Every structure is written in structure tokens, then in C-alpha cells.
């Protein structure tokens, strides 16, 4: 038993590791597109291949050679953090204070969908956002 464990460890340690040998490229979107988004709090990739990044200054949609910055129609300005989820044609953004927005593909803008405080009657902090396979939006507080 001891010898087989030793052989396994020697084989494992001497085997080349592919993850270490791969080259990865990191690109800074601020430098690539000349924009300023310093504090991104959420990022998702949608089914169309766009990368969406959310910050207090709005939501950024990035393609391979283009970008677009969307302003969110905040009801209050005390936004510290955003959460984001995407599945199918549904893209949802929620602020920590319960303002929930969805992307309207026809009008190409974000619209306020609802506010948690008006539905629940309290000011719970949004901690996560998920869209399940049935298209239902789950918000944890």
C-alpha cells in the first residue's frame, strides 16, 4: 500500500501540467475602449456571446470589437453594488437596495422591472440573483 501511494505521488508530480503551460491573454477593457469603469461588481455572458459588466455607473456590453454603456434608471442614488444574471433572452440587474431592472431587447435599454421594498415592505439587502432553467428570477436577501 505504501509503495503504491509513493508510485502514485511520483507519477503525479512528474507528469506535465497542461494548465500551467497554457498562455492566457488578459485585456483591460478600460484601455481597449477608452472608458472608465473601475468597480465592476457583476459580469455575465449572454447566449449571444456578449459580455455584460455592471457597476454603479451603469451596465457595459462588450463585443469583440465594440462596446456600449447603458445607464440604469435608478429610483434612488444610494447604489453601492449590482448583481446580474442572464439566461436565454432575459438579462436582469438588481441593486443591493432592491431595484430590479431588465434589459428590453426591442428598445435596447434597461427598464425598471420592480422594487423589492415596495413588494416586501422592507429594505432587505440583495445578496444574489439567479435565473433558473424555467426563466424564473430568484433573488436572495
Cite the ranges covered by each PLM segment:
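Carboxylate-rich, polar loop motifs that coordinate divalent cations or form catalytic acidic clusters
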Residues: 1-141
Amino acid at each position: 500500500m505504501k509503495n503504491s501511494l509513493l508510485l502514485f505521488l511520483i507519477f503525479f508530480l512528474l507528469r506535465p501540467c497542461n494548465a500551467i503551460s497554457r498562455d492566457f491573454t488578459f485585456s483591460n477593457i478600460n484601455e481597449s475602449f477608452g472608458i472608465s469603469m473601475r468597480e465592476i461588481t457583476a459580469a455575465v455572458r449572454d447566449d449571444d456571446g456578449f459580455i455584460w459588466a455592471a457597476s454603479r455607473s451603469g451596465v457595459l456590453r462588450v463585443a469583440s470589437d465594440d462596446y456600449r454603456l447603458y445607464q440604469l434608471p435608478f429610483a434612488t442614488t444610494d447604489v453601492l453594488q449590482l448583481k446580474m444574471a442572464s439566461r436565454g433572452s432575459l438579462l436582469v440587474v438588481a441593486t443591493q437596495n432592491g431595484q430590479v431592472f431588465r434589459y428590453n431587447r426591442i428598445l435596447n435599454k434597461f427598464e425598471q422591472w420592480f422594487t423589492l421594498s415596495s413588494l416586501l415592505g422592507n429594505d432587505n439587502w440583495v445578496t444574489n440573483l439567479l435565473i433558473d432553467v424555467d426563466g424564473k428570477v430568484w433573488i436572495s436577501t
